[in-house]
């Protein structure tokens, strides 16, 4: 940690460059998580279903291992295995001009976008916070929020496999003297869950519809565990504001049907990340404005 401090103060350009390059690699791994984790969960649910109804349905043979490490990544169209040279974050996509080397099928621009976004957000964290354990924790939180955002956008799902470790990680970090006292973190986790849970049931009783999912409750609880209960109002306010802006924009662009649900997780993630870095400044500005 002392080396990081010396590097940040003596050679800030090198420090930020290392953060950028390392986070590009993290972004590449996040692409794997975003793509594979929902598939892994679906396979697990299907296996559980078959185990419950084994006497009624035939058991398919599926010996293929599938997790974050295996099988090796390949083109979904021609099964061309992706080599190490073709898997360099950001650069490989540019070098291949966004096409598979085997069949020339287009490779989604989402892959380099996730890598670049992860790297840029990480550099902002490094530039905003003083190098230390708090910065490393903020980077970890940022990376998990990126993965949750894109999974929710794709599948309308916030997996427990990410939200629950994030919640317990926030409590553990604050137990060790992190951002807020442990008591504030515990209250933040409880209040974060209960606030959205209450809104969910109030909305359902009034309209008969579900306004959000339980994953949203757990994500706000996790943010409360990291940032404390004091950050919850600003997180809720910012997430509602960001959600309104994106929702209105999609409707105006006619790129979204009003009956189609919009995931709330990405807006919570964006608001939580903003509150992590600038929550105190926003609160002070707001209070000084109205008082």
From Swiss-Prot:
Binding site for Zn(2+): 75, 78, 100, 103
Single GO BP term: signal peptide processing
GO molecular function, one term: aspartic-type endopeptidase activity
Listed transmembrane segments: 14-34, 107-127, 131-151, 162-182, 186-206, 232-252, 262-282
EC number: 3.4.23.43, 2.1.1.-
Membrane topology: Multi-pass membrane protein
Gene3D superfamilies in UniProt: 1.20.120.1220
Pfam families: A24_N_bact, Peptidase_A24
Co-factor note (free text): Zinc is required for the N-terminal methylation of the mature pilin, but not for signal peptide cleavage.
Catalytic reaction(s) noted: Typically cleaves a -Gly-|-Phe- bond to release an N-terminal, basic peptide of 5-8 residues from type IV prepilin, and then N-methylates the new N-terminal amino group, the methyl donor being S-adenosyl-L-methionine
The UniProt record lists the keyword Methyltransferase: yes
Keywords from the named record: Cell inner membrane, Cell membrane, Hydrolase, Membrane, Metal-binding, Methyltransferase, Multifunctional enzyme, Protease, S-adenosyl-L-methionine, Transferase, Transmembrane, Transmembrane helix, Zinc
GO CC annotations on file: plasma membrane
Subcellular localization(s) per the UniProt record: Cell inner membrane
Cofactor dependence: Zn(2+)
PANTHER family (alphabetical): PREPILIN LEADER PEPTIDASE_N-METHYLTRANSFERASE-RELATED, TYPE 4 PREPILIN-LIKE PROTEINS LEADER PEPTIDE-PROCESSING ENZYME
Function (record text): Plays an essential role in type IV pili and type II pseudopili formation by proteolytically removing the leader sequence from substrate proteins and subsequently monomethylating the alpha-amino group of the newly exposed N-terminal phenylalanine.
Family: Belongs to the peptidase A24 family.
Protein name: Prepilin leader peptidase/N-methyltransferase
Species whose genome carries this gene: Aeromonas salmonicida (strain A449)
